[in-house]
């Protein structure tokens, strides 16, 4: 599997993922501004004055992080990314995900993750990981809902932009587990 196989536009109905580019800046800024409080439990803040520096860093983060703009019916409603995790061609992480409040609780995130997981496993990957702040119980529940298996808690794994030292819950889904859920 090559990067050109994995990091491609993906779409299903009104849901589309496009590799993040400068043209997404304004739409993503507007989406991120819809929930200023959520950034307290993220490693980085995309709110207010933090947005432009974080967006610029995200654009420069390849090849380790391959970010997408998430579209619903043509409107940018968030972001997500493939993140190198483990052996290239074997394992990848889905992370850096933010979805605007209007799309939460609608099944949109479930569709998004299914689209990405289907694609990752179709590209030949064996494992997809997820790292979630221990305080982010909504995201933990979402990962469990799609079949993520909790592998453990990485204690004091990183310092967030607020200075808080976070514990991180590690999840994964294996190809065999995903295939069993789909049959």
What are these regions (language model features)?
Residues 122-132:
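Conserved GNAT acetyl-CoA-binding A-motif
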Residues 136-152:
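Conserved active-site alpha-helix within GNAT-family acetyltransferase domains
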Residues 100-106, 135:
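Active-site acidic-Proline motif in GNAT/NAT acetyltransferases
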Residues 1-53, 177-183:
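A short, well-structured alpha-helix characteristic of acyl/acetyltransferase catalytic modules
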Residues 75-78, 138, 165:
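Glycine-rich acetyl-CoA-binding "A-motif" of GNAT/NAT acetyltransferases
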Residues 53-91, 95, 101-102:
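Acetyl-CoA-dependent GNAT
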Residues 131, 149-166:
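Conserved catalytic-core motifs of GNAT/GCN5-like acyltransferases
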Residues 105-119, 141, 145:
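Conserved acetyl-CoA-binding loop-helix of GNAT-fold acetyltransferases
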């Amino acid at each position: 599997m090559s990067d050109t196989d994995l990091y491609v536009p993906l779409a299903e109905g009104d849901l589309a993922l496009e590799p993040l580019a400068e043209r997404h800046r304004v739409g993503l800024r507007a989406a991120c501004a819809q929930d200023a409080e959520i950034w307290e439990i993220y490693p980085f803040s995309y709110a207010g004055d933090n947005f432009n520096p974080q967006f610029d860093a995200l654009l420069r983060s390849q090849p380790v992080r391959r970010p997408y703009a998430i579209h619903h019916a043509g409107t940018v409603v968030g972001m997500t990314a493939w993140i190198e995790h483990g052996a290239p061609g074997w394992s990848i992480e889905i992370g850096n995900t933010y979805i605007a409040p209007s799309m939460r609780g609608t099944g949109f995130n479930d569709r998004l993750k299914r689209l990405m997981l289907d694609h990752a496993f179709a590209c030949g990957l064996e494992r997809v990981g997820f790292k979630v702040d221990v305080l982010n119980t909504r995201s933990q529940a979402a990962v469990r809902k799609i079949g993520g298996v909790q592998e453990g808690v990485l204690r004091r794994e990183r310092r967030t932009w607020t200075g808080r030292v976070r514990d991180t819950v590690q999840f994964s889904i294996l190809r065999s587990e995903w295939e069993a859920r789909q049959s």
